[in-house]
Amino acid sequence: MLKLFSAFRKDKIWDFDGGIHPPEMKTQSNGTPLRQVPLAPRFIIPLKQHIGAEGELCVNVGDRVLRGQPLTRGRGRMLPVHAPTSGKVIAITPHSTAHPSALAELSVMIDADGEDRWIERDGWADYQRRSREELITRIHQFGVAGLGGAGFPTGVKLQGGGDKIETLIINAAECEPYITADDRLMQDCAAQVVEGIRILAHILQPREVLIGIEDNKPQAISMLRAVLADAHDIALRVIPTKYPSGGAKQLTQILTGKQVPHGGRSSDIGVLMQNVGTAYAVKRAVIDGEPITERVVTLTGESVSRPGNVWARLGTPVSHLLNDAGFCSSADQMVIMGGPLMGFTLPWLDVPVVKITNCLLAPSATEMGETPEEQGCIRCSACADACPADLLPQQLYWFSKGQQHDKATAHNIADCIECGACAWVCPSSIPLVQYFRQEKAEIYAIAQEEKRAAEAKARFEARQARLEREKAARLERHKNAAAQPAAKDQDAIAAALARVKEKQAQATQPVVINAGEKPDNSAVIAAREARKAQARARQAENIPAATEPVEPVDPRKAAVEAAIARAKARKQEQQTAAEPTEPVDPRKAAVEAAIARAKARKQEQQTAAEPTEPVDPRKAAVEAAIARAKARKQEQQAAAEPTEPVDPRKAAVEAAIARAKARKQEQQAAAEPAEPVDPRKAAVAAAIARVQAKKAAQQQVVNEE
């Protein structure tokens, strides 16, 4: 009794909500063995036959290829595709593929040479000695993908399972009507299928391996039981026929009683599922060393005279397979790739067979019936009762029709497996699956756009942060450069400080002037000349090397200027000799000397700052002649007019007015923009100003006394 209960508990199965029981229509094709189809003259191999990006091309137009030779390289989720036969690559161009939209995808076209020669095959009969990574890499590089319809790369799926897989499930349910590819494969190749299952179990090391098969396949069940008679590591579970018990989530719940969480995967609960055809492809890749170049395809429907299952090479045009099966086309003939519930109608028949093609259904007009007209939803809830995913199809229908993407997402439209059970039972003939497919595609497109926008925003913010960092670093460099002057600037600052200290030391010494003696201004003159020399040196450094050449000095003009200077000097000596020698106030003399030095220094700075312009010889000669005429006139007037006594008050007032005007002129000169000045003319004016200043000072002293 205990053994009976133990056996009952071991073989226990569960059920799932919803589901339907449509006509099976499997006897049309499952009664005949697998057969080979003659090679097509031309093969069309799409580069993308799986979930993920297409691989990188490794052949060119004109290359000769052998069967099993890689046409692309697979990295990551990029699964390679292989040549289905030997021949020549005649084109690499977009071509319509097996998809409801019939969009063109990049494909390799090969003209078969009829020899069907293989590449050199290297099988691993001792796969038990190979590491897990080696086996997964071989499976991936040999192009094995899920052959149950999803097309997910098998190597990636095995790699993602890791060590957390406790149960390996082999899906042999094949629940959709008309399709018998897995049923016939298990009948004819049961031993190879079981060997592939053992390879998968060796890679994953699960606690248990379960094969789930519906009870409407008695021949396949008997063949598997015969192969597994002495095996204790693989358990066969026969489940009731119910659509869609072959769905991944539904079969997981039937065999384990566990439900895959919303938005999750079966691996989250320790379960990994593979298809029967995938297990057979794994065996051929590992043990036989053959990449996947063909698969079993069901050819069925009343429009086919020879229904059955065939070994179809990947890339074979659909029209070639149907013609081999005795296809009788009509004006309104439809051909469905897949089953009647989850398949799609082909727009034309030159579409190639790919890895996920398991059935080609060519029904007659009476077999499928007329397509009823879509009517309004009556809220009968029949779709909700039939939904195996516990969704509310009527609500999802309204959300999809009203473009309410947020509400559709909140009602778990992503969990819809598109089995078509809701549309099958709908009394209003609403194509619910089409609405759901379109809504999921729109939601996916919106999510991709939001992802791209977020990535663009992140790139913009990163750029702004980088610019801010660069700006802060630039300001810091400028700040450090301003705080630490260059060595040349430091030398100039030190020289200026030394000059200031020297002047302060000279100013502290008392100035002693004896009456009757001429002041000794040799030190002041020497210092002035030194400063002028420094200014000229600095000006010479600042002038670029590419300046215009200095024009030669006119000797006549120089002689005239020298004569004028000598005449003024004689006149000044005569006036000094005529006037009585009086004692000079030392403080006043020191102040006047300081003022003269300041003015001279300012004049030198202006002269050094202003650019030197070329002197017009004619203009200089005219100015010299005018100056000589004015000098003669002043000498004649001074000799003719008698010397009058000078009013001290009036002289003082005039001196004050002169000083005020001088200050005003200095302020205006500082405020107004500097104009180019002739350096020679400026020097003459400065000399005249100094003479006039000395004369005014002497007159003021006389007036005060």
UniProtKB/Swiss-Prot annotation:
The keyword Iron-sulfur applies. The keyword Membrane applies. Its main location: membrane. [4Fe-4S] cluster 2 binds at C387, C416, C419, C422. Pfam families: Complex1_51K, Fer4_7, RnfC_N, SLBB. Keywords: 4Fe-4S, Cell inner membrane, Cell membrane, Electron transport, Iron, Iron-sulfur, Membrane, Metal-binding, Repeat, Translocase, Transport. Its EC number is 7.-.-.-. InterPro entries: 4Fe4S_Fe-S-bd (IPR017896), 4Fe4S_Fe_S_CS (IPR017900), Ion_transpt_RnfC/RsxC (IPR010208), Nuo51_FMN-bd (IPR011538), Nuo51_FMN-bd_sf (IPR037225), RnfC_N (IPR026902), Soluble_ligand-bd (IPR019554). It comes from the Bacteria. [4Fe-4S] cluster 1 binds at C377, C380, C383, C426. The complex is composed of six subunits: RnfA, RnfB, RnfC, RnfD, RnfE and RnfG. This is Ion-translocating oxidoreductase complex subunit C. It comes from Citrobacter koseri (strain ATCC BAA-895 / CDC 4225-83 / SGSC4696).
